[in-house]
């Protein structure tokens, strides 16, 4: 099965967590299961939320999916588990983590990044305040994450 990264169809592909269209490739995540089905996320934080969803378990019933994340600087697709993450980026859903191929001072590995997101070490509160001041969130009701 071909599990190489897919091209984003900006007119069609949407995040399965928040239902927003994929608008910024440099923060996108895609998961491809052994059947070749692809699901999209517009922010690594949305991906982390989905890990606890029953639909993720269904998606990977035939085996572990290959998961790609775009390098925040270049847009190159990286293996999500091998990438390094910096905190402080302005990301589509405000989690604040951008991926990089290279580890630099202050960057986190995948497991640490997931743990930080689950602990709420994100820019979500700042993001929500900004969106509220701009007239509200644009994602589906109840789908804007934690």
Where do the PLM segments sit?
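Intrinsically disordered, low-complexity linkers and terminal regions
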Residues: 1-40, 44-146
């Amino acid at each position: 099965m071909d599990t190489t990264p897919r091209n984003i169809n900006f007119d069609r592909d949407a995040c399965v967590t928040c239902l927003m269209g994929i608008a910024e490739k440099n923060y996108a995540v895609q998961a491809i299961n052994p059947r070749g089905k692809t699901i999209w996320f517009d922010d690594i934080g949305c991906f982390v939320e989905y890990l606890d969803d029953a639909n993720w378990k269904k998606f990977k019933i035939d085996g572990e999916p290959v998961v790609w994340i775009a390098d925040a600087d270049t847009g190159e697709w990286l293996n999500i588990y091998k990438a390094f993450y910096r905190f402080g980026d302005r990301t589509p859903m405000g989690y604040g983590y951008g991926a990089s191929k290279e580890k630099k001072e202050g960057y986190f590995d995948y497991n640490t990044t997931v743990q930080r997101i689950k602990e709420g070490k994100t820019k979500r509160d700042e993001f929500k305040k900004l969106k509220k001041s701009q007239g509200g969130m644009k994602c589906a009701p109840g789908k804007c994450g934690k």
